[in-house]
């Protein structure tokens, strides 16, 4: 099964090739603050692990049905809104396929190209005023499409960060590996001009992100970064706090990685380490969810993934490998709905493998298809 972690692993193996092109100024400069929780997790401690039937009340299997040219890659990102699934293939096909809540195909946004109404890449997708807004860093613009995939308008911006989130009074940008300014986060006005800088940095290291770092939450903005164990919060007054911090023991990214003046040496050291990669973070009124991948330096086949779920201040963890009964959860979590269902994008076989061990959680479904499936994992109260 191709999972999102596959893309992450490919990046890690090729990180040295990116050094000369993609450099980011990064450092660890968090102020001392004891008001946040530090969550410790040892993935090798069996007492820390939880069974799926303790986490989920049921699973809902939704086959994605579409025309022959709609080929769903399970590495794609997913947005769920207003009873629609938006499957975002930003890596391979550079398109967005839209399905209803039953998995029936609605339309596609496939404007990849170089004309005035086409984007070269998909770096972020937002749903704004019933339109789909596609941000392309290369084009320095947002492209708006309606639900039928028809182009509506183009919105150029002055400065183009790697990741972009449009808000009421402007934009948030993630500078990432651009290395153009000494900050990881910028606030921009409605024209895309930088007006504020956040999370100042001082060292040069290579870094990239597989999914958006931005998580809007109750009027604040949360920031998740792949190789950092802190989730930062920028509140409505512009102050930066640590929202929550994770301690993975020996899998924590070495501090020397952020302090090394030589980006090649830093990347080499990272590839020689067993590390935790914070892939996704979700939060709603009742739950926090962290998807974290663990890379093994000496054995790529030994890599594994863990899903952390917090409810009523208690964290539970589910560890999964890329084979076996729990392979369906191997770095495949895409989103958390407001009704507290985790969205997983999977092929049929991992679901069948899971069903053999946990038949009470999985309903009967038609698996004689080449299509991918949306799996809604309903969290227990």
Regions found by a protein language model. Give the residues of each.
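Beta-strand-rich domains and repeat architectures in extracellular enzymes and scaffolds
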Residues: 60-94
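Short coil/turn segments at the loop-to-beta-strand junctions that recur within blades
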Residues: 68, 110-118, 156-162, 201-206, ...
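Blade-loop segments of beta-propeller domains
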Residues: 65-70, 104-130, 136
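Conserved blade-ending motifs and adjacent loop-strand segments that build the rim/top face
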Residues: 244-264, 309-339
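Blade/loop signatures of beta-propeller domains
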Residues: 31-65
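Repeated scaffold domains used in trafficking and secretory/extracellular systems
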Residues: 73-77, 119-124, 159-167, 206-213, ...
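C-terminal motif of bacterial Sec signal peptides marking the signal peptidase cleavage site
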Residues: 26-27
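Asp-box/WD-like beta-propeller blade repeats and closely related beta-sheet repeat scaffolds
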Residues: 121, 136-183, 197-206
């Amino acid at each position: 099964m191709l999972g999102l972690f596959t893309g992450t692993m490919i990046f890690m193996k090729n990180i040295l090739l990116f050094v000369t092109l993609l450099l980011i100024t990064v450092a660890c400069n968090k102020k001392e603050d004891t008001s946040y929780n530090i969550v410790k997790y040892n993935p090798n401690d069996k007492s820390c692990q939880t069974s799926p039937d303790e986490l989920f009340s049921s699973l809902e299997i939704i086959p994605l049905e579409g025309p022959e040219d709609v080929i769903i890659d399970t590495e794609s990102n997913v947005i769920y809104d207003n009873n629609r699934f938006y499957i975002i293939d930003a890596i391979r096909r550079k398109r967005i396929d839209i399905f209803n809540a039953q998995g029936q195909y609605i339309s596609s946004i496939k404007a990849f190209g170089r004309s005035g109404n086409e984007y070269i890449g998909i770096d972020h997708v937002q749903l704004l005023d019933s339109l789909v807004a596609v941000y392309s860093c290369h084009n320095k613009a947002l492209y708006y499409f309606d639900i039928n995939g028809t182009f509506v308008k183009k919105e150029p911006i002055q400065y183009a960060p790697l990741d972009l989130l449009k808000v009421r009074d402007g934009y948030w940008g993630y500078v990432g590996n651009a290395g153009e300014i000494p900050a990881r986060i910028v606030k921009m006005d409605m024209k895309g001009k930088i007006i504020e800088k956040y999370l100042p940095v001082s060292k040069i290291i290579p870094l990239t992100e597989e999914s958006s770092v931005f998580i809007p939450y109750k009027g604040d903005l949360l920031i998740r970064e792949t190789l950092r164990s802190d989730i930062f919060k920028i509140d409505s007054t512009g102050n930066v706090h640590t929202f929550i911090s994770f301690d993975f023991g020996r899998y924590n990214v070495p501090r020397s990685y952020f302090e090394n003046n030589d980006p090649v040496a830093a990347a080499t050291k990272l590839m020689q380490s067993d590390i935790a990669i914070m892939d996704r973070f979700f939060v709603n009124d009742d739950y926090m969810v962290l998807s974290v991948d663990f890379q093994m330096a000496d054995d790529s086949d030994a890599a594994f993934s863990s899903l952390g779920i917090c409810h009523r201040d208690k964290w539970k963890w589910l560890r999964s490998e890329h084979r076996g009964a729990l392979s369906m959860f191997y770095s495949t979590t895409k989103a958390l709905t407001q009704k507290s269902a985790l969205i997983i994008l999977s092929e049929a076989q991992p679901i069948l493998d899971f069903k053999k061990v946990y038949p009470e959680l999985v309903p009967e479904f038609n698996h004689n298809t080449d299509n991918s499936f949306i799996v809604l994992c309903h969290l227990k109260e």
